[in-house]
From Swiss-Prot:
Membrane topology type: Single-pass membrane protein
The protein's name in its UniProt record: Photosystem II reaction center protein Psb30
A Pfam family it matches: PSII_Ycf12
Principal subcellular localisation of the protein: plastid
UniProt keyword list: Cyanelle, Membrane, Photosynthesis, Photosystem II, Plastid, Thylakoid, Transmembrane, Transmembrane helix
């Protein structure tokens, strides 16, 4: 059970980081385009 829990936590962490990084990357790209 412990291994399954770790895998679930790892997947949730990856999904969370992806959801958080998505908007940040879009924001940084828009800022760079604005500066150029």
């Amino acid at each position: 059970m412990g291994n399954l829990d770790l895998e679930i936590i790892a997947q949730l962490t990856v999904v969370t980081l992806t959801l958080l990084a998505g908007p940040v990357i879009v924001f940084l790209l828009s800022v760079r385009k604005g500066n150029l």
